[in-house]
A protein has these predicted regions:
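Short, flexible helix/strand-to-coil boundary loops that buttress conserved ligand/catalytic motifs
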Residues: 69, 78-81
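Charged phosphate-binding loop/patch that engages nucleotide di/tri-phosphates or the phosphate backbone
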Residues: 87-91
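Residues that form generic nucleotide/phosphate-binding pockets
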Residues: 22, 80, 84
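Short S/T/G/P-rich N-terminal loop/turn motif that feeds into the first structured element of a domain
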Residues: 1-53, 60-70, 93-96
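Long, contiguous binding/interaction regions
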Residues: 17, 75-76
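Residue-level marker of structural boundaries
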Residues: 28, 73-74, 83
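Conserved catalytic core of Hanks-type protein kinase domains
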Residues: 58-59, 84
Length: 96
């Protein structure tokens, strides 16, 4: 299984909800076994860094993750989120 984790910070804190709504579009892509978007609780903040939202998804394999990223909804989401975000940090790792 591949675990996919992405951290987002909004360029303007007023846009966090707009970004969250756009990221929720990704839940309609059928290739993920599990998908969720959540607001960071900020309980372990790092000085100089801010994470507003977290995307967490699980995929059966690398092919499923690649299909997810190739889906038209993924491209649509990027077009909506990219102008509103400050940073995006992603990590994928094999589990199990």
């Amino acid at each position: 299984m591949i675990r996919h984790i992405v951290f987002f910070s909004a360029a303007n804190p007023d846009n966090v909800e707009r970004i969250r709504e756009a990221l929720m579009m990704l839940a309609d892509i059928p290739h993920a076994r599990h998908f969720e978007v959540g607001r960071n609780l900020q309980s372990d903040a790092i000085a100089g860094a801010r994470v507003d939202l977290v995307v967490y998804a699980e995929f059966e394999n690398e092919a499923a993750l690649a299909a997810y990223k190739a889906h038209p909804i993924y491209a649509e989401c990027i077009a909506l989120v990219r102008p509103l975000r400050d940073q995006r940090i992603a990590a994928d790792f094999k589990s199990g």
